[in-house]
C-alpha cells in the first residue's frame, strides 16, 4: 500500500502510518510525525 493521493496519510487499514515520499512510514502517535 502506497500513499493516498489526496493527503499525506496512508491507508487507514495499515495502522498509524504516514507518507514520506512515496512510502508509508510508522507514525509517532505522541507527536503525530513520521518517524
Curated annotation (Swiss-Prot):
Q: Which SUPFAM superfamilies match?
A: omega toxin-like
Q: What does this protein do?
A: Insect-selective toxin causing rapid but reversible paralysis in crickets. Suppresses the excitatory postsynaptic potentials evoked in lobster neuromuscular synaptic preparations, possibly by blocking the presynaptic calcium channel (Cav). Induces instantaneous reversible paralysis when injected into crickets.
The protein's name in its UniProt record: U2-agatoxin-Aop1a
- Tissue range of expression? Expressed by the venom gland.
Taken from the record, one Pfam family name reads: Toxin_7
Which family is this protein grouped under? Belongs to the neurotoxin 01 (U2-agtx) family.
Q: What is its main location?
A: secreted
- What is the additional note? The primary structure of the mature peptide is identical to that of U2-agatoxin-Ao1a (Agelenin) from Agelena orientalis (AC Q5Y4Y5). Negative results: does not inhibit mammalian Cav2.1/CACNA1A, Cav2.2/CACNA1B and Cav2.3/CACNA1E calcium channels.
Which compartments does it reside in? Secreted
Tell me which UniProt keywords the record has, alphabetically.
Amidation, Calcium channel impairing toxin, Disulfide bond, Ion channel impairing toxin, Knottin, Neurotoxin, Presynaptic neurotoxin, Secreted, Toxin, Voltage-gated calcium channel impairing toxin
Site (Critical for insecticidal activity) found at: 9, 28, 33
CC terms in the record's Gene Ontology section? extracellular region; host cell presynaptic membrane
Which Gene Ontology molecular function entries are recorded, alphabetically?
calcium channel regulator activity; toxin activity
**Which residues are annotated as modified residue Leucine amide in the UniProt record?**
35
Disulfide bonding pattern of the chain:
3-19, 10-24, 18-34
Question: Domain remarks in the entry?
Answer: The presence of a 'disulfide through disulfide knot' structurally defines this protein as a knottin.
Q: Which domain of life is it from?
A: Eukaryota
Amino acid at each position: 500500500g502506497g500513499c493516498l493521493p489526496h493527503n499525506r496519510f496512508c491507508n487507514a487499514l495499515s495502522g498509524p502510518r504516514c507518507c514520506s515520499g512515496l512510502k508509508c512510514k510508522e507514525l509517532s502517535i505522541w507527536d503525530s510525525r513520521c518517524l
